[in-house]
From Swiss-Prot:
The gene is MT-CYB. This is Cytochrome b. Binds 2 heme b groups non-covalently. Its cofactor is heme b. It comes from Bison bonasus (European bison). InterPro entries: Cyt_b/b6_C, Cyt_b/b6_C_sf, Cyt_b/b6_N, Cytb/b6-like_sf, Cytochrome_b, Cytochrome_b_C_euk/bac, Cytochrome_b_N_euk/bac, Di-haem_cyt_TM.
């Protein structure tokens, strides 16, 4: 008699994805972030569900409903802070996951990579809309500034912005629709993530060497299930340290002031995970140019498979590529720092240089390094 996990229609899918899946024997801890993102997503959906039970998406009561959750609901404070800091953990894992894909050449799996880029954009949209919901000062002004960017689109811009707002400014209609979208998107993300996995399992995982590992596979369970559990425990430990000891560390104090359309905060800035994008956006003096640079800073990921010149799959054996990769990481950290600084003399120039370097690294320097490494191999 066949094992039920191999014959049952539903169990068979789970078995082929998480139990008998042939996995490379040499994948490092950088391959843990996929499962950690799954853990983050489930955690965000669960905490978000419980928050939605007490939240009201009305401009007059939204701010006080969040206060009510923190003060009066049983363990509401921990649910709220797990959700807010869970978003930060989500983005840490996301950026690590994308960085791993870049470093080890996982972008050669085109479908998986492109669906990953769609996932990244969807998660960013979800996080942005979630940040608007508490209806604090930074929520309101962040929503105003970011939605206003669409008015830079020629001809249809103004109509488009007013259509998204549901009026002539960010108001009740905007908050209600953002809540609706923020609720539905995580489920859409879950569906896209399943397609992401489906395409990944068509080819099998990549590995640090960038060489096919078909000759050396091990079963996913127990080897990688136990490894993923360890990763998840470390993730939850880090999250709970943040939630219980420094819940407001990554937040903005301005968001504890209720939204006031008549009073603009001195520095309108997004959450830390969008600061690099904000820095690229504001380093270009022209509005439309800034919006295009902002969009392209993420969409450039789609072009990376086309810009791959190296004969090696991975950067593991490419010293030049490695140097450039880590310089790119340093550049992104610089952009993140600049995004949090006021728009004044030294910061503007640093931001512009870092923005130029960001695109230069990806479009020019890394492909050139790949070509040089090919030459070195022949030499």
């Amino acid at each position: 008699m066949t094992n039920i996990r191999k014959s049952h229609p539903l169990m068979k899918i789970v078995n082929n994805a998480f139990i008998d899946l042939p996995a490379p024997s040499n994948i490092s801890s950088w391959w843990n972030f996929g499962s950690l993102l799954g853990v983050c997503l489930i955690l965000q959906i669960l905490t978000g569900l419980f928050l939605a039970m007490h939240y009201t998406s009305d401009t007059t009561t939204a701010f006080s409903s969040v206060t009510h959750i923190c003060r009066d609901v049983n363990y509401g404070w921990i649910i709220r802070y797990m959700h807010a800091n869970g978003a930060s953990m989500f983005f840490i894992c996301l950026y690590m996951h994308v960085g791993r894909g870049l470093y080890y050449g996982s972008y050669t799996f085109l479908e998986t990579w492109n669906i990953g880029v769609i996932l990244l954009l969807t998660v960013m949209a979800t996080a942005f809309m979630g940040y608007v919901l508490p209806w604090g000062q930074m929520s309101f002004w962040g929503a105003t500034v970011i939605t206003n960017l669409l008015s830079a689109i020629p001809y249809i811009g103004t109509n488009l912005v007013e259509w998204i707002w549901g009026g002539f400014s960010v108001d009740k209609a905007t908050l209600t629709r953002f809540f609706a979208f923020h609720f539905i998107l995580p489920f859409i993300i879950m569906a896209i993530a399943m397609v992401h996995l489906l395409f990944l399992h068509e080819t099998g995982s990549n590995n640090p060497t960038g060489i096919s590992s078909d000759t050396d596979k091990i079963p996913f369970h127990p080897y990688y299930t136990i490894k993923d559990i360890l990763g998840a425990l470390l993730l939850i430990l880090t999250l709970m340290l943040l939630v219980l000891f420094a819940p407001d560390l990554l937040g903005d104090p301005d968001n504890y002031t209720p939204a006031n359309p008549l009073n603009t905060p001195p520095h309108i800035k997004p959450e830390w995970y969008f600061l690099f994008a904000x820095a690229i956006l504001r380093s270009i003096p022209n509005k439309l140019g800034g919006v295009l640079a902002l969009a392209f800073s993420i969409l450039i990921l789609v072009l990376i498979p086309l810009l791959h010149t190296s004969k090696q799959g991975s950067m593991m054996f490419g010293p030049l590529s490695q140097c450039l990769f880590w310089a790119l990481v340093a550049d992104l950290l610089t952009l993140t720092w600049i995004g949090g600084q006021p728009v004044e003399h030294p910061y503007i120039t640093i931001g512009q240089l870092a923005s130029i370097m960001y695109f230069l690294f990806i479009v020019v320097l890394m492909p050139t390094a790949g070509t040089i490494e090919n030459k070195l191999l022949k030499w």
